Amino acid sequence: MSNLAETAPISSAHIPTLKLIDCSLRLCVIPLSVATIWLTVTNQQDNSIYGKLEFSNLTGLKYMVCISGISAGYALVAVVASWVRCLVNKAWLFFVSDQIMAYLMVTSGAAVLEILYLAYKGDRGVSWSEACSSYGRFCSRVNLALALHALALCCFLVLAVISAYRVFSMFEPPVSSKEVEEERAS
């Protein structure tokens, strides 16, 4: 029995630490995503010259709100599922789901980053002037929401690495072709 414990790919001492880090990161994602949603949805500014600007006027912000909602919901479900005995052994499920969430967070963050770039710099080639001088408070709140979204993304990137470690540590390391040839020869 002791030989089995010694040859296990993941030592039992790492599991509680890894599980604690995993759960902590998932729990951190929830308030970060909720704060991102709240900052974005309540963001609006009225300008006497150009009119009212709301988050719903910009598709990239709506996309970020949707992805933030999905990430908060997924993080909550994943925290609960990580303590359910029958789902704990589903390392592939967490691996694939964490990868998907990380990619979705990257795409939504990139969409908002593009909006902010155009809002701050404009695009003279297509006659778009910068807008943040007229809507400074709106741009500042979007910046803050994007920063919170980026922190949630960092949590998912670490979670993706942890779940990849869990999945791939279940398998033996690859054998080099020389070792295979030597084994066949003997």
Curated annotation (Swiss-Prot):
Topology in the lipid bilayer: Multi-pass membrane protein
Transmembrane helix among keywords: yes
InterPro entries: CASP/CASPL (IPR006459), CASP_dom (IPR006702)
Subcellular location, record wording: Cell membrane
Positions annotated as glycosylated: 57
One Gene Ontology cellular component annotation held by this UniProt entry: plasma membrane
Keywords for the protein's UniProt record, in alphabetical order: Cell membrane, Glycoprotein, Membrane, Transmembrane, Transmembrane helix
Pfam family, one: CASP_dom
Residue spans, topological domain Cytoplasmic: 1-20, 85-99, 165-186
Main location: membrane
TM region(s), chain numbering: 21-41, 64-84, 100-120, 144-164
Ranges per topology, Extracellular: 42-63, 121-143
Keyword ATP-binding in annotation: no
Oligomer status and interactors: Homodimer and heterodimers.
Record-stated family: Belongs to the Casparian strip membrane proteins (CASP) family.
Record's protein name: CASP-like protein 2D1
Lineage: Eukaryota, Viridiplantae, Streptophyta, Embryophyta, Tracheophyta
